[in-house]
């Protein structure tokens, strides 16, 4: 059986919020505050609106997004959150200000990118030619286009046969649809997928729902010290080749 290995992006391929170290060194505020400040500045650039009202509208837009992500299993592009804030103040026609803000929010982690998880480059070299390799990742602020740029800047993009990002396919983990889409793009049966990620529900239960394997990666953050559903737990990417050997993958 032809196999494919897919990786989560955040806290699996890269260390989430490791960019905060660089931001701090440059005297920049943490990303949540930087985003809120940018929203306030953008709205106040086109209308006389109080800062507290803008921040409240931004918080409401974020709450709506997290409901869509966690309950509806979809992650609309950040432009929807921006549009919601502007609409709160009757500023739907301020399209230039919205577009500029969207670009800023969507590229914040591209300008100051996260660092790679240990051993990522080496394992991708090891997997090349042995299995099909993909990414299955939810997108929160940085869309799929931005995550591709981060991968290119780390010289990793060429290792992947398919990249499935939730804002582009209209569904997010643990939806069955995102794993079925990955299998389709990688040219393998769903039960030939082996997915690696740091979250039990998303990265173990999700792939298992389509007959695929889900492995926990705890090399950056161990979210499940007691394990999750008997899934293998890997503390380093260099364990993947031996795990494939154990499955009889040539």
Which residues make up each language-model segment?
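Asp-based, Mg2+/Mn2+-dependent phosphohydrolase catalytic module
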Residues: 1-9, 15, 30, 41-52, ...
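N-terminal helical cap/lid subdomain that shapes the substrate entry/recognition surface
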Residues: 2-117
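Conserved acidic, metal-coordinating active-site core of Asp-based
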Residues: 99, 103-113, 131-132, 162-166, ...
């Amino acid at each position: 059986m032809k196999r494919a290995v897919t990786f989560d992006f955040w806290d699996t391929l890269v260390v989430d919020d490791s960019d905060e170290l660089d931001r701090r060194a440059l005297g920049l505020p943490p990303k949540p505050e930087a985003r809120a400040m940018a929203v306030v500045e953008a709205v106040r650039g086109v209308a006389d609106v109080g800062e507290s009202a803008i921040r409240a509208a931004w918080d409401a837009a974020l709450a709506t997004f997290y409901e869509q992500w966690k309950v509806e299993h979809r992650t609309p592009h950040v432009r929807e959150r921006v549009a919601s804030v502007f609409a709160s103040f009757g500023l739907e026609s301020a399209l230039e200000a919205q577009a500029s803000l969207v670009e800023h929010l969507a590229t914040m982690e591209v300008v100051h990118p996260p660092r790679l998880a240990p051993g990522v480059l080496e394992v991708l070299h090891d997997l090349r030619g042995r299995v099909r390799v993909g990414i299955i990742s939810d997108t929160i602020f940085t869309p799929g286009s931005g995550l591709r740029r981060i991968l290119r800047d780390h010289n990793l993009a060429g290792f992947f046969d398919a990249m499935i990002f939730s804002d582009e396919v209209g569904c997010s983990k643990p939806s069955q649809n995102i794993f079925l889409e990955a299998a389709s793009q990688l040219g393998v049966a769903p039960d030939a997928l082996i997915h690696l990620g740091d979250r039990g529900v998303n990265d173990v239960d999700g792939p298992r729902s389509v007959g695929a394997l889900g492995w926990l990666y705890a090399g950056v953050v161990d979210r499940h010290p007691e394990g999750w559903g008997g899934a293998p737990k890997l503390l380093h990417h260099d364990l993947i080749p031996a795990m494939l050997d154990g499955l009889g993958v040539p």
